[in-house]
């Protein structure tokens, strides 16, 4: 596999998954096409893509739930499916089905017992996790899971994914179905895990959340990785200035501002030229600066543009 200066916790090389369908199994669906990527220790990595892009298939392949048709993958230095690795990773599925007659506390005890965590450790670990994910301890002891809201279920799901204190955590659509407050709280949990040095790999189609918390991202569409990198690498550095000016003459401002237009009693546009020179020239134009901000394309704009270039839409 690829050598890097930073330690990698996850690597894939030409990973491919093909399903056979039809009565005679003579039709092929390529769910993953030669996916190659690296996730480094301690980073938060976001996998983006429209519905049906293959995000969950890739994640389940990495977890050993789905067997790849071809290609290779390493997790924590071992081949996917290695039993010793399973003790060191956590997983939150998108659509989790828990035994809902258990209380939240009993459920976490069950998961802890699967990992053979001693009772003495459980007594300390479970309250810590409940505090981390924002679930009341008494509620977790008394209330059955079938009485939990969507947000509470997501929190208990995150807690079970962390019960074994994993080095690498997989989240499948952790913000799915949550209201803005719930999404904010899950983002805060992920940021807390990041500060603890955990490596986080998650799927999402909520681009604003990914943009706020990820160190690097990958865009997956129709099973193919279209790009992998940091936001600066993918979107480019923010070296374009958006300017808003009050007053001044249009013919003079046009020499400095590209796409000059009048809106809400101000001139708006994109600065061409050096900011210092523009600021020095403002007084001679009898104009006053309202704002001058660095700007770049949003992740959403980039995402839609990449899909359109390839004739793809989010509904496909």
Where do the language-model regions lie?
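ABC-family P-loop ATPase nucleotide-binding domain
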Residues: 1-18, 25-28, 309-316
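Sequence-level motif detector for i,i+2 pairs with an aromatic at +2
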Residues: 5-7, 42, 238, 264
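ABC transporter nucleotide-binding domains
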Residues: 10, 17-202, 207-208, 212-221, ...
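Generic beta-strand hydrophobic packing signal
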Residues: 13-15, 35, 260, 292
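Short, flexible helix/strand-to-coil boundary loops that buttress conserved ligand/catalytic motifs
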Residues: 84, 235-238, 307
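ABC transporter nucleotide-binding domain
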Residues: 187-272
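Short, charged/small-residue-rich alpha-helical element at the C-terminal edge
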Residues: 240-310
